Amino acid sequence: MNHMVIASRGSRLSLRQDEIVSESLKKNGVTTEVTVIRTRGDLDSTHALKDIGGSGLFIREIEQVLADREADIAVHSAKDLPYDLREGLVTGAVMPAADSADLLVIRNREIRVIGTGSARREAEIRRLYPEAEIRGLRGNIETRLRKLEDGAYDAIVIAEAGIDRLGVDLSPFQVKKLTPEEMVPACGQGIIAVECRADATEVREQLKAVNDEETMRRFLPERYLFGLLRADCSMPVGAHAVVDGDRITLYALYMDKKSRISGSCSDYRELCRTLADRVM
């Protein structure tokens, strides 16, 4: 196959991620085109994700297009993937990861009101800033920063990966990069995942050629841990891995509990099970 149709969300960040995948495939002689799909999460941009609830808010409609063979691959922010992909679909590749950290972007030195629409971020912010008021915040990166600039919030929490990929200038603000100890990232944060049909042999071979093995070494443990936690957007859950050579450190957040564990990469499944037992 020398041409692929990509199913994707239509945000500026999503389209930039499509470009990254397309550029990688092009080096292997594959051309692409994008079909934009509006997901349930896109259609409701008012309510907090934790209030909409459910699993795969930004994924399921795209997976349907893939399953119906109207597209060859789907490009996602891996943090949006539910722990259970649709039957018959697999993650065929991941692209080189961007930074996985969350950023606290600050307008006012005296932080009284912090904006986020994520249950995970809200839970962690309440630990870090117990006196602050947490207010809901939705929208794309530009919308969220505009609301911050307009004075609706003193600070907001945003993923560094999106800022980096879009080249957004944060110089008007003070920026605090949060460590995994301060805020456990979402599973797959900073990773672009490419989904395809399990029976699409040729597509899977072409994706294997562009897969980033180093990122996959982080992606697989995070996905395994996330699957053990079995959570959705309505729950404060984080699953993060830091790989250093043959060593791995795993971080987990589940509701009001968090913990970490380190060991050999080859033992990541056992480490994940131990960590999940600690926090659940």
What are these model-predicted stretches?
Residues 1-38, 43-44, 49-51, 122, ...:
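Small-molecule-sensing regulatory modules
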Residues 5-7, 74, 92, 115, ...:
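Short, well-ordered beta-strand segments
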Residues 47-73:
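Short, structured active-site "lid" loops
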Residues 58, 76, 157-159:
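Short beta-strand and adjacent tight-turn residues that come in two discontinuous sequence segments
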Residues 71-75, 154-155:
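Short, Asp-centered acidic motifs that coordinate Mg2+ and/or phosphate
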Residues 78-79, 85-135:
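A conserved helix-loop-strand patch within extracytoplasmic ligand-binding domains
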Residues 78-81, 161-163:
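Short glycine-rich anion-binding loops that position phosphate/pyrophosphate groups of nucleotides
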